């Protein structure tokens, strides 16, 4: 399988638990996970933030006043995808615990999910789109050696 090129910027906001998340998110892992979800070459910034920054961005850009797991800001989809993926560390950590997943596994899934959004995939437009996106996410996660993220 030929993987597309990725220009990655990986950023960690300053917060108390940042070292834990930095240890899980090596540049090589993040690059591998994102590249498996790319259908085109890409320039992507991944930023790991605390709850305060996550909530502020979600409120400002989606008018939802809470921190969410991943926000995708896509600027261009072709010929090169350009996007920022913002992941809220406390939310990711809580969800991983609630779903009995490792932190690494949940980050991998959310990075795949956000990368698909950066290329125009959308699960909020219709049930069919949601099913197609979930099926593709599952296929990618299995290729990466992880379990089906939607398995009950």
Swiss-Prot record:
It is found in: Cytoplasm. Keywords: Cytoplasm, Endonuclease, Hydrolase, Metal-binding, Nuclease, Ribosome biogenesis, rRNA processing, Zinc. GO terms for cellular component: cytoplasm. GO terms for molecular function: metalloendopeptidase activity; RNA endonuclease activity; zinc ion binding. One of its GO terms (biological process) is rRNA processing. This is Endoribonuclease YbeY. Its main location: cytoplasm. Binds 1 zinc ion. It comes from Delftia acidovorans (strain DSM 14801 / SPH-1). Transmembrane segments: none annotated. The keyword rRNA processing applies. The keyword Oxidoreductase does not apply. Coiled coil: none annotated. Zn(2+) binds at residues 113, 117, 123. Single strand-specific metallo-endoribonuclease involved in late-stage 70S ribosome quality control and in maturation of the 3' terminus of the 16S rRNA. Pfam families: YbeY. It comes from the Bacteria. It is an enzyme of class 3 (hydrolase). Belongs to the endoribonuclease YbeY family. Its cofactor is Zn(2+).
């Amino acid at each position: 399988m030929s993987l597309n090129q990725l220009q990655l910027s990986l950023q960690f906001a300053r917060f108390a638990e940042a070292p834990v998340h930095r240890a899980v998110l090596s540049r090589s892992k993040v690059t591998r996970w994102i590249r498996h979800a790319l259908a085109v070459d890409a320039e992507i910034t991944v930023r790991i933030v605390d709850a305060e920054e996550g909530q502020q961005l979600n409120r400002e850009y989606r008018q939802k006043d809470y921190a969410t797991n991943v926000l995708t800001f896509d600027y261009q989809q072709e010929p090169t995808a350009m996007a920022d993926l913002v992941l809220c560390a406390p939310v990711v950590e809580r969800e991983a615990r609630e779903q009995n997943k490792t932190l690494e596994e949940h980050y991998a899934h959310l990075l795949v999910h956000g990368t698909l959004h950066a290329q125009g995939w959308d699960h909020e437009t219709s049930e069919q789109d949601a099913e197609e996106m979930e099926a593709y996410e599952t296929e990618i996660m299995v290729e990466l050696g992880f379990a089906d993220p939607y398995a009950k």
